[in-house]
Amino acid sequence: MPMDIQKIREYLPHRYPFLLVDRVVEVGENNIVGYKNVSINEEFFQGHFPDYPIMPGVLIVEALAQISGILGFIMNNETPKPGSLFLFAGAEKVRFKKQVVAGDQLVLKAELVMQKRGIYKYNCTATVDGKVATTAEIIVSHLRTEQA
């Protein structure tokens, strides 16, 4: 079930400059693969770092959390609606192994390892050109308000 940016916007409440998933290319029963195209025009490159632009690691982790949230909706056979969100609840075992720079395509992968009472834990990897840039265990929480 590939998703273009319009479909992704249905699943995530994030908008520019914090929407960090450009496309979903693969969805399995418990896993998802997508990507973020990293452009020199990203706002964060103005300050991180002007003479040596590197994508901030925390934004790579956020991109992994966003793709994990999309998978949470899909695994629940739920389409997003007002009052239903997957929120970034935590990150464990985060490791940064390779710099991500302008022009890179960051491949984002998440695989479910645990689900309990609305809490989901995913093993996540971000790669560039087949080389691991970041690994993390991402935790998201399914929030349902009265509107849902």
From Swiss-Prot:
State the GO CC annotations: cytoplasm; membrane
According to its UniProt record, where is this protein mainly located?
Answer: cytoplasm
Q: Write down the Pfam families for this protein, in alphabetical order.
A: FabA
The EC number of this protein is 4.2.1.59
Q: Which UniProt keywords apply?
A: Cytoplasm, Lipid A biosynthesis, Lipid biosynthesis, Lipid metabolism, Lyase
Protein's GO biological process:
fatty acid biosynthetic process; lipid A biosynthetic process
Catalytically driven reaction(s): a (3R)-hydroxyacyl-[ACP] = a (2E)-enoyl-[ACP] + H2O
Q: Where in the cell is it found?
A: Cytoplasm
Q: What class of enzyme is it?
A: lyase
Which positions are catalytic residues? H48
Give the molecular function GO annotations. (3R)-hydroxyacyl-[acyl-carrier-protein] dehydratase activity
Superkingdom of source: Bacteria
Q: Which family does it belong to?
A: Belongs to the thioester dehydratase family. FabZ subfamily.
Q: What does this protein do?
A: Involved in unsaturated fatty acids biosynthesis. Catalyzes the dehydration of short chain beta-hydroxyacyl-ACPs and long chain saturated and unsaturated beta-hydroxyacyl-ACPs.
Q: What HAMAP family does the entry give?
A: FabZ
Under what name is this protein listed? 3-hydroxyacyl-[acyl-carrier-protein] dehydratase FabZ
Instruction: Print the organism lineage.
Output: Bacteria, Pseudomonadati, Pseudomonadota, Gammaproteobacteria, Moraxellales
Protein encoded by which gene: fabZ
